[in-house]
Regions:
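N-terminal secretory signal peptides that target proteins for export/translocation
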Residues: 1-5
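Bacterial N-terminal signal peptides
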Residues: 8-20
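Short, flexible, glycine/charge-rich loop motifs used to bind or transfer phosphoryl groups or to couple energy/partner
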Residues: 22-24, 100-101
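A structural "domain/chain start" motif
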Residues: 24-71, 78, 83, 181-256
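Generic beta-structure capping elements
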Residues: 35-37, 75, 128-132
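Catalytic-center loop of serine/cysteine hydrolases
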Residues: 79-202
Length: 256
């Protein structure tokens, strides 16, 4: 999608930046947002993988949340901004729009990327980092899965980003406001890191990753019952899969 995105008032920007959407406790660490990955697959089965980019982003957020050198924007907040800006159905977001989106999210850096599937379980993932302030693109990466293992591929990508992405710290906040932000982030981070530890010990095939991505879509669309059914289907295959377990609990509490 190459359409223009209108930016709201400064009040909207300020509200977005102030929202408690960060998942790492260090208040002076730079804020990073992971956007949904583009489906760059081709062939007659291309459309079958359209939802996978959301699942890849969600799992990458979970994995990167354990890095104390950055604060990562929650996927729920990203989805909310995409809905506000009428970008939910966009197949891809151009760099200029991505920068504007980053400002609304209060992020200093964006991780964007795409994936290609060969239809047999092997994925090729590319990613890059965009500076919201300058629009500069850095840290281009290209990785291929070792067999039908989406989590292994995301783990590789997360490790490379965490290792190679050298982000300067922001001025440290002081006073009660900083303490309140830090406390809220610590509590959210604990849950995310628990999920990240679980994902590293398992393999997740493309078919199940697509199922998980569809569950996220149903959850975002306000269909908790359908989302719960899909999360249960994922957990039937992978009982210890933390992200699915956490999201199932969330949709159950909202009306399953």
């Amino acid at each position: 999608m190459r359409g223009r995105m209108s930016i709201g008032t400064w009040a909207l920007v300020a509200a977005a930046m102030a929202a408690p959407t960060l998942v790492v406790a260090q208040s002076n660490a730079p804020v990073v947002a992971v956007l949904y990955f583009d489906n760059n697959s081709f062939g007659k089965d291309r459309a079958d993988y359209d939802g996978l980019g959301k699942g890849i982003a969600d799992l990458l957020i979970t994995d990167m949340a354990g890095n104390p050198a950055m604060r990562v924007v929650e996927r729920d907040r990203l989805q909310s901004i995409l809905q506000e800006q009428d970008l939910v159905k966009s197949k891809s977001i151009d760099p200029q729009t991505a920068v504007k989106l980053g400002k609304l999210l209060g992020a200093a850096y964006l991780v964007t990327g795409g994936f290609m599937s060969d239809g047999k379980g092997t994925l090729l993932v590319t990613s890059r980092v965009i500076s919201v302030e300058t629009g500069a693109i850095t840290n281009p990466l290209k990785l291929q899965s070792k067999g039908d293992d989406v989590l292994g591929l995301i783990g590789q990508l997360s490790t490379k980003l965490n290792t190679e992405l050298k982000l300067p710290a922001l001025p440290r906040q002081t006073g009660d406001a900083g303490a309140r932000k830090s406390g809220a982030a610590t509590s959210s981070s604990s849950a995310r890191q628990a999920g990240a530890e679980t994902t590293k010990s398992q393999k997740l095939d493309v078919k199940t990753a697509l199922l998980y991505s569809k569950a996220l879509d149903e959850q975002d669309s306000g269909h908790p019952k359908q989302a719960a059914e899909l999360y249960r289907a994922v957990l039937q295959k992978f009982p210890d899969f933390g992200p699915a377990r956490q999201n199932l609990a969330k949709v159950q509490s909202s009306g399953d």
